[in-house]
C-alpha cells in the first residue's frame, strides 16, 4: 500500500539561497487565480491532462515534491485540460478543487513558493469500446511529480492575497522532466521486457511487462540445473530492491527516518542490502530465481496482478506470458509445485490473490501486511453495511473515520483527507494514488469508461451496487469461503498471513475477519498460518526477532528457507529436486 517517496525528490537548494531570498523580498503579487501555459518549444501540438498548481511555504525543495498524506503536506489545486494549445493559458481559479484547502480563496494572504505542472494524458481506444484519456506510465512507476514528459514551471516566491482583484498570475511550464535511464545489469541481476499480446489487445496499443531477475549463485556453472521461481510482489521496482554488490559507502551522510525514528537509516539499508548479496552468493543459501515485476498501468505503479475491467488482463498476462518467458529464458522448472510468491502491503495482497486466482500455479504465498483482503474492513469501512466512508453513522455527530495513524495511534490523516488529496490531483480516478487504484482494480467500468466509484469522492456516500461487484470479484476472504469446495484441496496449507496490530493503515482489521473465515473452513481445513505482531506498524512480515525497520529489509532471507520447507512437504513424486541443490 505505502509508496515510499522518491529519493531524488529531496533536492538540496542550498546553493540557491541568495537567489531565493532575493526572490522572496521582491515577490510579485497575485490574487486567487493563475494562468498556466506552456511554450511551443515544449509542444507544438495541443495537450490533454491535469494542470496542477502547487503552493508551499517551504522553499528547500520544489512544491511538486511536497504533497503528502500527513500534516507536513503543502497545497495542490487542479483542473482538467483537453486540447490545451501552446501559449494558451489554463486558468486555475477559486473553482479549482484543492487539498488540503478546498479552494484558493481559503489561502491566508502571504508569500508562497509556487509552481505549476501539467500531468499529460494520452487517449486510449480500449477493446471494450471505451475511449479514455489517462496518464501513461513513462518508466517512473506512475508518479506525476517525476513522470518523464510532464511539464512544469520553475518555482518562485509569489505574494498571494485572495482579496486582490487582479488578472490571473502567469506561470509558464517551460521545464520538462527528462527520461529515466534503464537500470544496469550485473552477473546476478538481469532485466527483461516483453510486449504483452493480451494487454496490447485490451488497450489498443503496445503494452509491455518488465521484470528484474535475481540469478542464483552458480547459474552459469550449472547449465543443466533448473530452478524454482519466487515471484516477489510489491510496488514498481527500479531494479532488484534491497540488493547491493559492493560494500556500504563509509562516507554516506546519515539521514533521519521519521517513520522508524532512526538516525542513519540509509546506512542500515546499505548494510542489509550488501548482507543480502553476501548471503545470496554464500554457501548453503537456496538456489532459486527471484523475480520482481514491473506492471504499471495508467492508474497506478502496479496492476495488482489480477484481471480487471479497467486495467485489463494483467493476471493472465503475467502468468501466461511473462512468467513462462522468464522460466524458459532462465531455466525455471516451470511447474506449480516449484513456484512461490511473497510480498508486503500491495505485494501482500497480490501474493494472496495469485494463490487464490491461480491456485495450481503456486505452492505457497507468504502474505505480509496485505491491502484489504476482506472488504468488511476496507481499512476502517465496511462497504457492505456502512452508508458513508468518511464519517460514522450518527444522528447528531459527524465523527470522521481515520485514514492513517502513527505508532502511538495518533491520527495523521482522515479517510476524507486522503480521498480529497486524490480528487485534487485528478478527476475520474486518475490520480495514480492508493484509493484510486483500488477502485480501478476492483470496480466495473462506468458508462464513461472510467472506474465506477465505490463512493462519491467528495461526500463519501457508498454505492452498494459497486460494493456487491467488489465482493463477488475481489473480496479474497469471501471468495475463499464461497469457492472452498474447489479451492480447498488446491490451497490447503499454502496461505501464510502476517500483519502488525498497529498497522498504520488499519490493515490488521481485514486480517481479523479473514482469520475467522479461514478457521471456519472444513473439508479440507485451510491449515493457514495467521500471525500478528504486537505493537507492530506497517509493514510487519512475521519476524518476531527483529524490529520492523530491519525485518522489512530481509524478505528473501526470511521466506526462501520457508519455501524450501514447503517443497520438502509438498512436491509430486519423480520431479527434479536435486539439480538446483548445490
Regions found by a protein language model. Give the residues of each.
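Contiguous beta-strand segments within globular domains
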Residues: 28-38, 44-52, 206-212, 231
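Non-catalytic cap/lid and distal C-terminal segments of serine-dependent acyl enzymes
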Residues: 57-97, 102-582
Amino acid at each position: 500500500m505505502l509508496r515510499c517517496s522518491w529519493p531524488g525528490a529531496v533536492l538540496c537548494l542550498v546553493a540557491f539561497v541568495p537567489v531565493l531570498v532575493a526572490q522572496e523580498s521582491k515577490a510579485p503579487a497575485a490574487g486567487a487565480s493563475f494562468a498556466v501555459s506552456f511554450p511551443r518549444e515544449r509542444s507544438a501540438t495541443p495537450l490533454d491532462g491535469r494542470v496542477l498548481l502547487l503552493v508551499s511555504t517551504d522553499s528547500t525543495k520544489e512544491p511538486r515534491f511536497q504533497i503528502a498524506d500527513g500534516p507536513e503536506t503543502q497545497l495542490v489545486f487542479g483542473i482538467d485540460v483537453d486540447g490545451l494549445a501552446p501559449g494558451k493559458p489554463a486558468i486555475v481559479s477559486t473553482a479549482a478543487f484543492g487539498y488540503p484547502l478546498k479552494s484558493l480563496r481559503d489561502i491566508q494572504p502571504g508569500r508562497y513558493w509556487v509552481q505549476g505542472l501539467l500531468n499529460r494524458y494520452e487517449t486510449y481506444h480500449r477493446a471494450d469500446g471505451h475511449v479514455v484519456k489517462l496518464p501513461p506510465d513513462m518508466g517512473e512507476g506512475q508518479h506525476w511529480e517525476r513522470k518523464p514528459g510532464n511539464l512544469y514551471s520553475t518555482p518562485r516566491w509569489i505574494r498571494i492575497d485572495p482579496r486582490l482583484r487582479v488578472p490571473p498570475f502567469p506561470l509558464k511550464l517551460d521545464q520538462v522532466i527528462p527520461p529515466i535511464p534503464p537500470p544496469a545489469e550485473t552477473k546476478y541481476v538481469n532485466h527483461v521486457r516483453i510486449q504483452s499480446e493480451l494487454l496490447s489487445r485490451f488497450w489498443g496499443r503496445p503494452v509491455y511487462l518488465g521484470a528484474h531477475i535475481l540469478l542464483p549463485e552458480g547459474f552459469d556453472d550449472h547449465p543443466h540445473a533448473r530452478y524454482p521461481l519466487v515471484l516477489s510482489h510489491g510496488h514498481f521496482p527500479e531494479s532488484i530492491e534491497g540488493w547491493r554488490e559492493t560494500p556500504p559507502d563509509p562516507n554516506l551522510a546519515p539521514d533521519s527516518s521519521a517513520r522508524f525514528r532512526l538516525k542513519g537509516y540509509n546506512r542500515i539499508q546499505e548494510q542489509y542490502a550488501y548482507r543480502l548479496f553476501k548471503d545470496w552468493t554464500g554457501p548453503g543459501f537456496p538456489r532459486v530465481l527471484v523475480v520482481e515485476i514491473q506492471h504499471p498501468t495508467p492508474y497506478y505503479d502496479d496492476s495488482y496482478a489480477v484481471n480487471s475491467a479497467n486495467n485489463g488482463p494483467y493476471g493472465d498476462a503475467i502468468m501466461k506470458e511473462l512468467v513462462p518467458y522468464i522460466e524458459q529464458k532462465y531455466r525455471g522448472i516451470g511447474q506449480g509445485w516449484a513456484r512461490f510468491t511473497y510480498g508486503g502491503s500491495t505485494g501482500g495482497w497480490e501474493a494472496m490473490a495469485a494463490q487464490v486466482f491461480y491456485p495450481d500455479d503456486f505452492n505457497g504465498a507468504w502474505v505480509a501486511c496485505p491491502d484489504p483482503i476482506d472488504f468488511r474492513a476496507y481499512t476502517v469501512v465496511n462497504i457492505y453495511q456502512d452508508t458513508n466512508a468518511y464519517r460514522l453513522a450518527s444522528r447528531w455527530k459527524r465523527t470522521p473515520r481515520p485514514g492513517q495513524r502513527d505508532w502511538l495511534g495518533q491520527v495523521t490523516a482522515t479517510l476524507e483527507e486522503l480521498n480529497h488529496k486524490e480528487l485534487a490531483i485528478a478527476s475520474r480516478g486518475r490520480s495514480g494514488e492508493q484509493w484510486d487504484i483500488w477502485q480501478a482494480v476492483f470496480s466495473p467500468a462506468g458508462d464513461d469508461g472510467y472506474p465506477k466509484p465505490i463512493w462519491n469522492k467528495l461526500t463519501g456516500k457508498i454505492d452498494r451496487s459497486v460494493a456487491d461487484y467488489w465482493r463477488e470479484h475481489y473480496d479474497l476472504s469471501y471468495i475463499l469461503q464461497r469457492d472452498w469446495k474447489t479451492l480447498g484441496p488446491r490451497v490447503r496449507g499454502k496461505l501464510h498471513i502476517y500483519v502488525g496490530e498497529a498497522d498504520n493503515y488499519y490493515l490488521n482489521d481485514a486480517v481479523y475477519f479473514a482469520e475467522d473465515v479461514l478457521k471456519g473452513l472444513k473439508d479440507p481445513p485451510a491449515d493457514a498460518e495467521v500471525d500478528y505482531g504486537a505493537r507492530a506498524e506497517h509493514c510487519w512480515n512475521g519476524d518476531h526477532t527483529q524490529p520492523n525497520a530491519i525485518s522489512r529489509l530481509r524478505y528473501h532471507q526470511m521466506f526462501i528457507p520457508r519455501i524450501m520447507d514447503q517443497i520438502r512437504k509438498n512436491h509430486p513424486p519423480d520431479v527434479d529436486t536435486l539439480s538446483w541443490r548445490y
